[in-house]
Amino acid sequence: MRTQWPSPAKLNLFLYITGQRADGYHTLQTLFQFLDYGDTISIELRDDGDIRLLTPVEGVEHEDNLIVRAARLLMKTAADSGRLPTGSGANISIDKRLPMGGGLGGGSSNAATVLVALNHLWQCGLSMDELAEMGLTLGADVPVFVRGHAAFAEGVGEILTPVDPPEKWYLVAHPGVSIPTPVIFKDPELPRNTPKRSIETLLKCEFSNDCEVIARKRFREVDAVLSWLLEYAPSRLTGTGACVFAEFDTESEARQVLEQAPEWLNGFVAKGANLSPLHRAML
């Protein structure tokens, strides 16, 4: 029997870089919100203990794929604690809609969906805390997808406080370039000393993203899309890019702007969601 699981996108409604640790990782303050749009992961259980990804990603080795790594990590963790039923395995496939290097959290979301779904399907019984801790070893954004609620994040993104920002409508646009996260974080001109503020203060301020100035300067495609969107609505970069988003109060407003978009602008309209579509599917 094949089951399907949402793997939603996220937006960083704001992102501030507050410092850099000795190990090179950047400390930040950011606000995560999910979208009711994303990839779909299909899982069919096996009884021979094997993990197979039926939809490989070009240029990514099978065992290096975050989906496979997440499944193997859950398998090992559950087995080590005697909570993995004998023969547990899975065939996994993905209907990929989220771009790589887009700042929408696609890979992290995929890993989280696999952890949550297989924990349920294999009946391992691991807690959300355990799954989030495992997820952090796969990527800094994985825990927020595992926990499934919009959150204010600090540290390197692993210290999460659930929040409920307004669930607006967004026009999300992809400039047609992929921006690897290290390209932004290694840039010498990236602001790295934004003062820390309380979540209460930040929620009252105008939102912005410290990475945006670098993305616009280094990638003219990002600058072009943002310049166009800003004519219509408050707009900014998500994560380290490359995707940007404009926010609206209604779906019709967002769709009207998308209909006017030039041919070179690829985008979609989605609603913000404080409860992840993955967790909504589990209810």
UniProtKB/Swiss-Prot annotation:
Subunit structure: Homodimer.
HAMAP family per the UniProt record, alphabetical: IspE
UniProt family annotation: Belongs to the GHMP kinase family. IspE subfamily.
Single GO molecular function: 4-(cytidine 5'-diphospho)-2-C-methyl-D-erythritol kinase activity
Pfam families for this protein: GHMP_kinases_C, GHMP_kinases_N
UniProt key word Amino-acid biosynthesis: no
UniProt-annotated catalytic positions: 10, 141
EC annotation from Swiss-Prot or TrEMBL: 2.7.1.148
Pathway: Isoprenoid biosynthesis; isopentenyl diphosphate biosynthesis via DXP pathway; isopentenyl diphosphate from 1-deoxy-D-xylulose 5-phosphate: step 3/6
GO BP of this protein: isopentenyl diphosphate biosynthetic process, methylerythritol 4-phosphate pathway; terpenoid biosynthetic process
Function recorded in the entry: Catalyzes the phosphorylation of the position 2 hydroxy group of 4-diphosphocytidyl-2C-methyl-D-erythritol. Phosphorylates isopentenyl phosphate at low rates. Also acts on isopentenol, and, much less efficiently, dimethylallyl alcohol. Dimethylallyl monophosphate does not serve as a substrate.
Domain of life: Bacteria
Alphabetical list of InterPro entries matching this protein: GHMP_kinase_C_dom (IPR013750), GHMP_kinase_C_sf (IPR036554), GHMP_kinase_N_dom (IPR006204), IspE (IPR004424), Ribosomal_Su5_D2-typ_SF (IPR020568), Ribsml_uS5_D2-typ_fold_subgr (IPR014721)
Reactions it catalyzes: 4-CDP-2-C-methyl-D-erythritol + ATP = 4-CDP-2-C-methyl-D-erythritol 2-phosphate + ADP + H(+)
Keywords per UniProt: ATP-binding, Isoprene biosynthesis, Kinase, Nucleotide-binding, Transferase
Protein name (database record): 4-diphosphocytidyl-2-C-methyl-D-erythritol kinase
SUPFAM superfamilies documented for this protein: GHMP Kinase, C-terminal domain, Ribosomal protein S5 domain 2-like
Entry binding sites for ATP: 99-109
